[in-house]
Amino acid sequence: MIVRILLLFIALFTFGVQAQAIKESYAFAVLGEPRYAFNFNHFDYVNPAAPKGGQITLSALGTFDNFNRYALRGNPGARTEQLYDTLFTTSDDEPGSYYPLIAESARYADDYSWVEVAINPRARFHDGSPITARDVEFTFQKFMTEGVPQFRLVYKGTTVKAIAPLTVRIELAKPGKEDMLSLFSLPVFPEKYWKDHKLSDPLATPPLASGPYRVTSWKMGQNIVYSRVKDYWAANLPVNRGRWNFDTIRYDYYLDDNVAFEAFKAGAFDLRMENDAKNWATRYTGKNFDKKYIIKDEQKNESAQDTRWLAFNIQRPVFSDRRVREAITLAFDFEWMNKALFYNAWSRTNSYFQNTEYAARNYPDAAELVLLAPMKKDLPSEVFTQIYQPPVSKGDGYDRDNLLKADKLLNEAGWVLKGQQRVNATTGQPLSFELLLPASSNSQWVLPFQHSLQRLGINMDIRKVDNSQITNRMRSRDYDMMPRVWRAMPWPSSDLQISWSSEYINSTYNAPGVQSPVIDSLINQIIAAQGNKEKLLPLGRALDRVLTWNYYMLPMWYMAEDRLAWWDKFSQPAVRPIYSLGIDTWWYDVNKAAKLPSASKQGE
């Protein structure tokens, strides 16, 4: 009997050891393996011999009033999100990989329940003081107590503790690879500075920081100048070699984009990304373009893309019925807008995983059906029988077929025409809602959309407000419909929970106000499957079907190409990264600059 108990104890102890084997690595990937091997020299998309020097001047729209990117009020200055280095950093030619920056390496349990991060002993803040494990612990606590509520929700129960001067231990409340890696992107604050400042409050002066650039001058609301840190401790790390080549980065603020565009053409700043299709087609002309002083470049995007949508606030009674949301989607004539207003510059959004293999572009396969079938009674039938595609019009400005379909859906939902007005068949209440827009937004498309809705008897009021009012109304969910940018997602990540899970209903990221047990179930499975592509593929596609067929948001468009123009005073590596424009790899070319008109030679 004693022998059997002893053997059982040994077996249990051995199982415990096996269940939490300890691993160590210098680099990590959410899916698969990191692209770059241990002791790699530099990223493939940089020129490690790029010369340092010169200035690049960029533009920003609006104004700024502080230097704290994490403040809960105010407008932080351009580039303030890059003041601080992070424990690990990513590369721009692969999704979801992490390489050492402040950290040197990490050892972790193979079930991702904990990780111990070793800090590089050379890591320094700009005043020369060392970055320590205590600073990492302090930073996490700062975010938990004074940061945005979403951070506290995601990391509730997680602990971060300095267990040695240069070692920090993270214990996760919910073991998971992606949650562990998400904390690798944590910026590290100096405790000695931030212990006397609230993270939620604006800063009138730049904080003590640690990145490759520091703020050296500014005029509040008008311009910011960043200077390269000449003794930057991490300049020669593999992740930084060939990057951060400009001595100075200057941002000039403009209140109006048209004024900014004319300033660019006059040489007041150096580089402009163009989002207005008409501008790109008609205004990038003149002698400076003819003589190639200004380069106009358009490159196809092959990676996951940001997409634009109109979010229905489905907690408003007017949008609680899916048929109403579908009817309004049918009234959005993308083909006409794209041809008449945008010079066919946009592509139509059709997925929350645009340009990735996780987009549901075929009929559901067996693996997806296993996931979806148990929830069939709570799903639109189209999830199982059709491939989602936004309505397509003839592009003539009056698509009778789509409007007839919309009329049928509205009647089925209890909204009937009375004269020229769409009213509720029971209460007589008109079908009316407000479209909330940022004051600075391009709204060429709004009036045609409004006119199309009027043909259905629907009244859409238009209200433009400044950014602070937009933020306040989002936080209080005081809107009917508003535009949203859905950020590119290379794979279905645990970030989805902030945008769609019922637990995060008060998050401003959940613009439609969705609370769905079906979506909660899929997202919980996605979180559990992080790192497992075989499981994530059907889960991502299943979620995509559920979201699109429920019409929580109206698909607008996305940019299939990057449109960029710059004064020809820069050189860049032969290889462009897939997941960014790669401006951080460019350098000032004195020979090119010498050939330009004098007005555009700034930066020498």
Swiss-Prot record:
Signal peptide positions on this chain: 1-19
InterPro entries attached to this UniProt entry: Peptide/Ni-bd (IPR030678), SBP_5 (IPR039424), SBP_5_dom (IPR000914)
Keyword Heme: no
GO cellular component terms given for this protein: ATP-binding cassette (ABC) transporter complex, substrate-binding subunit-containing; membrane; outer membrane-bounded periplasmic space
Keyword Signal attached: yes
A molecular function (GO) term: ABC-type oligopeptide transporter activity
Keywords: Signal
Single GO BP term: microcin transport
Stretches of the chain forming a coiled coil according to its record: none
Superkingdom of this protein's organism: Bacteria
Record-stated family: To H.influenzae HbpA.
PANTHER family cross-referenced by the UniProt entry: ABC TRANSPORTER PERIPLASMIC BINDING PROTEIN, PERIPLASMIC BINDING COMPONENT OF ABC TRANSPORTER
Protein name as it appears in the record: Uncharacterized protein YejA
Gene name of the encoded protein: yejA
